[in-house]
C-alpha cells in the first residue's frame, strides 16, 4: 500500500513538472485599432514582458493574460517587466499574472492612461497616489480579486479612500469596494471584504481607526501630502487670480475718475449758469449811478459810498449804440 502511494506521488509530481503555464500577450497598435500577439518569455518561473525596443513606437497599449496560473501564487509564478514600456500606453491589461506590488510600475503610468485592468493578480499593496490619479481622471480601473493587506503599508490607501469616498469613488464601479479582496495576517479571504468583515464605508472606518491607533504618523503624512497637492493645484490659478484682481482695480479706478470728472463738470456748469444770469460787479462794495445830462458814451459813474469821485468809463452795449446813433440823426 505504501509503495502504491509513493508511485502516485511521483507520478503526480512528474505530471505537474511537465505542465507549463500558458501566457498570451498582445500589444495594441493605434493605427488600425487591432491587437497583435507577442511571445512572452517564461524563465525560472518568471514571466518576462517584452522589452521596450521590441514593441513598435506607435503601440498604444499592452494586454497580457496568463492562463493556468493560480492567483494564489501556488505555482510560484511572478512577473517582471520593463516599466519604460508603460509610459506611453493608453491601455494596460495584465490579468492573472501574479503581480504582487503595483507600486513597481508606478513610474510607468503616464497621463495618457485611459484603461487599467489588473484583475486576478496577487496585489498586496496599492500606492494611493496612483489610485488618486486614476480616480480623479475618471480612468476605468479594475483591481478586484486581488489580495490587499490590512497592514501599515496600505494605511495611506484607506485614509485616501475614506477622505475621497463621497467625491471620487462614485466615478468607479460599485464593485470596486465590494469585490476587491483583502487579507489579514496572511489569511486569504476572497470575493468579499475581510479585515473585520465590514463592507464599504464601515470597513474604511474600521481600517482608518486601526491605522490611527497603531500608526498615527501615517495619518499626519497623508494629510500633509493631500494638502500639499491641493496647494500645488491652486498655485496654477494664482496668475489668473492676480490678473483678475489687477483688472478689477483698474476698472474701479477708471470708474472713480469718471465719477469725479462728472461731479466737477456738473459743479462748473452751475457756476457758469449763475454768472450768465446774475451780474457780479468787479467792485461789489461800490454803488453806481449814471448822470442823466451826460451822453451814455461819455457817461461818468459817481461813487456815493466814498467822498472821492473816481470816473469810470462806461462801455455801452450794441443796442445803446444804435439808440444813440438814431438820436444824432
From Swiss-Prot:
The segments annotated as topological domain Extracellular are 32-239
Compartmental location: Host endoplasmic reticulum membrane; Host Golgi apparatus membrane
In this chain the LRR repeats are located at 112-133
The record's keywords, sorted A to Z, are: Disulfide bond, Glycoprotein, Host endoplasmic reticulum, Host Golgi apparatus, Host membrane, Host-virus interaction, Inhibition of host innate immune response by virus, Inhibition of host TLR pathway by virus, Late protein, Leucine-rich repeat, Membrane, Signal, Transmembrane, Transmembrane helix, Viral immunoevasion
Q: Where are the transmembrane segments?
A: 240-260
Topology with respect to the bilayer: Single-pass type I membrane protein
Q: Cite a GO CC annotation.
A: host cell Golgi membrane
Instruction: Please name every pair of cysteines joined by a disulfide bond in this record.
Output: 195-237
Swiss-Prot/TrEMBL induction comment: Expressed in the late phase of the viral replicative cycle.
Domains (record comment): Contains putative leucine-rich repeats (LRR) and a C-terminus cysteine-rich capping motif similar to domain structure of host TLR3.
**What's the protein called, per UniProt?**
Transmembrane protein I329L
Amino acid at each position: 500500500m505504501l509503495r502504491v502511494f509513493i508511485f502516485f506521488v511521483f507520478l503526480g509530481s512528474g505530471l505537474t513538472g511537465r505542465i507549463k503555464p500558458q501566457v498570451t500577450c498582445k500589444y495594441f497598435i493605434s493605427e488600425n485599432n487591432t491587437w497583435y500577439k507577442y511571445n512572452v518569455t517564461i524563465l525560472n518561473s518568471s514571466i518576462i514582458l517584452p522589452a521596450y525596443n521590441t514593441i513598435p513606437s506607435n503601440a498604444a497599449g499592452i494586454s497580457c493574460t496568463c492562463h493556468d496560473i493560480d492567483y494564489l501564487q501556488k505555482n510560484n509564478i511572478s512577473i517582471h517587466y520593463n516599466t519604460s514600456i508603460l509610459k506611453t500606453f493608453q491601455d494596460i491589461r495584465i490579468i492573472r499574472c501574479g503581480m504582487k506590488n503595483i507600486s513597481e510600475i508606478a513610474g510607468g503610468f503616464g497621463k495618457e492612461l485611459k484603461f487599467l485592468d489588473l484583475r486576478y493578480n496577487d496585489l498586496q499593496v496599492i500606492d494611493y497616489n496612483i489610485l488618486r490619479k486614476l480616480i480623479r481622471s475618471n480612468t476605468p480601473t479594475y483591481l478586484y480579486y486581488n489580495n490587499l493587506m490590512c497592514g501599515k503599508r496600505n494605511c495611506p490607501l484607506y485614509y485616501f479612500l475614506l477622505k475621497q469616498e463621497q467625491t471620487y469613488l462614485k466615478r468607479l464601479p460599485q464593485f470596486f469596494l465590494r469585490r476587491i479582496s483583502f487579507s489579514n495576517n496572511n489569511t486569504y479571504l476572497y470575493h468579499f471584504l475581510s479585515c473585520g468583515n465590514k463592507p464599504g464605508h464601515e470597513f474604511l472606518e474600521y481600517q482608518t481607526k486601526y491605522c490611527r491607533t497603531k500608526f498615527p504618523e501615517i495619518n499626519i503624512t497623508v494629510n500633509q501630502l493631500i494638502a500639499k497637492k491641493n496647494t500645488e493645484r491652486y498655485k496654477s490659478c494664482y496668475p489668473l487670480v492676480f490678473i483678475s484682481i489687477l483688472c478689477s482695480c483698474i476698472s474701479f479706478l477708471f470708474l472713480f475718475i469718471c465719477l469725479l470728472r462728472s461731479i466737477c463738470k456738473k459743479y462748473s456748469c452751475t457756476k457758469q449758469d449763475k454768472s450768465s444770469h446774475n451780474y457780479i460787479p468787479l467792485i461789489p462794495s461800490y454803488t453806481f449811478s449814471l448822470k442823466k445830462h451826460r451822453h451814455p458814451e461819455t457817461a461818468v459813474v459817481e461813487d456815493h459810498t466814498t467822498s472821492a469821485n473816481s470816473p469810470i468809463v462806461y462801455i455801452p452795449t450794441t443796442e445803446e449804440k444804435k439808440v444813440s446813433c438814431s438820436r444824432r440823426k
